[in-house]
Amino acid sequence: MTRGFTPSLPVEFPKMGSFRRPRPRFMSSPALSDLPRFQAARQALQLSSNSAWNSVQTAVINVFKGGGLQSNELYALNENIRRLLKSELGSFITDYFQNQLLAKGLLFVEEKIKLCEGENRIEVLAEVWDHFFTETLPTLQAIFYPVQGQELTIRQISLLGFRDLVLLKVKLEDLLLLAQPQLPSSIVQMLLILQSVHEPTGPSEGYLQLEELVKQVVSPFLGISEDRGLSGPTYTLARRHSRVRPKVTLLNYASPITPVSRPLNEMALTPLTEQEGEAYLEKCGSVRRHTVANAHSDIQLLAMATMMHSGLGEESGGEDKCLLLQPSFPPPHRQCSSEPNITDGPDEPEQGATGSQEDSELNCASLS
């Protein structure tokens, strides 16, 4: 019996999806027919930026001319500036405001002041400053409120522009001397506010010229003077209309203070610091800083103040300047006047008491 041969049939299994990700279909390069559409979109964006900037420029010039903002105009200007910050012009808004808009707006202010002569120019300058400080400056800050995080703020840029483009071009040196008895308070306010604005690169020539004007109307005056012999600026304290004759007074007090070396470039107007820490307590022997044992130092300060102002009842003299000099015993930091003297050993107080007075001289020079 022969076995029949049964042909095998192919078995079909259910097909599963491929685990391999399909190849991405790359877009073909844009056709030449799409270029007009791209150019039209870019031109529309540029037109939108130009329209936004033109609205800002028109509003700023109108503010300098004495006008104000319309209803809801401030919101629209802020939105336009936010849109400009996101565009290609975003990094140039501050520079364009400083070099173009501010210069053009302050030109109207300068021309208004130069139309007057003599003492009338002082009065017009006071009125212009009042309007600029109370109306124009706050409006400019509100318009450019979205512009933040710059090296100089809109307020500082505007005040520096008023100083350089208006005040220093009016030439008030002679006018301030003539109008000294009846000088408007707005002029003094203007000079002090402009003096408080500093450039990030240090005192400029315009700042030094401004200080010469402040020096004529403010007494006592504390300012910065450039000394060619020193590496940095020098702080000068000047007093006008002094009633004492120019003289140099040397106050000498014997005090057991050990001189400590101090670098020359360190400013004399460093802030007061108090000694703290365990090492200080061990050195002073757990003695409180404020004791009666060191009351002579307070007496020295009172004597200094009395001798400096002892000539107030004398006849009037010329201009008086008091230079803030470094004492001959400069410590590494300024200590409080009632701080006890600290010695390194028990034998040093007697030695310090019999030492030379040259190491403990306190120099106060009153020069003219």
Swiss-Prot record:
One of its GO terms (cellular component) is TORC2 complex. It comes from Bos taurus. This is Proline-rich protein 5-like. Interacts with the mammalian target of rapamycin complex 2 (mTORC2) which contains MTOR, MLST8, PRR5, RICTOR, MAPKAP1 and DEPTOR. Interacts with RFFL. Interacts (via C-terminus) with ZFP36 (via C-terminus); this interaction may accelerate ZFP36-mediated mRNA decay during stress. Interacts with RICTOR. It holds the Pfam family HbrB. Associates with the mTORC2 complex that regulates cellular processes including survival and organization of the cytoskeleton. Regulates the activity of the mTORC2 complex in a substrate-specific manner preventing for instance the specific phosphorylation of PKCs and thereby controlling cell migration. Plays a role in the stimulation of ZFP36-mediated mRNA decay of several ZFP36-associated mRNAs, such as TNF-alpha and GM-CSF, in response to stress. Required for ZFP36 localization to cytoplasmic stress granule (SG) and P-body (PB) in response to stress. PANTHER family: PROLINE-RICH PROTEIN 5-LIKE, TARGET OF RAPAMYCIN COMPLEX 2 SUBUNIT BIT61-RELATED. The gene is PRR5L. It comes from the Eukaryota. The keyword Phosphoprotein applies. Keywords: Phosphoprotein, Signal transduction inhibitor, Ubl conjugation. The modification Phosphoserine is found at residue 28.
